[in-house]
Amino acid sequence: MYRGTASSTAATEVGTVRDVTITTDPQKAPTTTRGTAGTPPVETEGVVSIKWSCDWTMVNDTSDASLTAFRTAAAAGSPIALRLKDYSAGKGFDGDVTLSCKEGQPLAGEQTFDFTATPTKKSGRAPLVYS
């Protein structure tokens, strides 16, 4: 995972994330047409948009610059650049995102932050789901 300033490709590696989940969910609409000569139609559908999100967890560490950047962006509703790769030279998401944040404060154990990123075009850059 890489982070950066919105409207540019993220270049700062974030090595302190864990439990990353990427969700790609094609949104569909019906495309069924009438059958002919007494033949019932077969229901069909087509993709009209793609819903994408990324969830990850970070352990609270006040010296972690990436955690601070993510928390600041989430609190302000400001977009940031996010780049994900399936391996070091691989492909993945590249675009600007907005973040939501949940803070876990367990009675026992470590304090964590759970982030969810969703794409935005607010900074003028179209998201690429797998590039």
Residue ranges and their predicted role:
Residues A65-T98:
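Short, acidic/charged, Gly/Pro-enriched secondary-structure junctions
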Residues D55-T57, P79-R83, D114-T118:
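Secondary-structure boundary/capping motif
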Residues S8-A11, S63-A65, S88-G95, G124-L128:
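Short, surface-exposed beta-strand/loop "edge" segments at domain boundaries and coil↔beta transitions
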Residues W52-A69:
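Charged, amphipathic alpha-helical segments
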Residues Y2-S8, L84-A89, P119:
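Short acidic, glycine-rich loop/turn motifs
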Residues M1-T57, D94-D114:
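Solvent-exposed edge beta-strands and adjacent loop segments
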Residues P26, M58-T62, D86-S88, C101-Q105, ...:
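Beta-strand elements of well-folded, non-transmembrane domains
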Residues Q111-S131:
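Protruding loop/beta-arch "assembly-hinge" segments enriched in small, turn-prone residues
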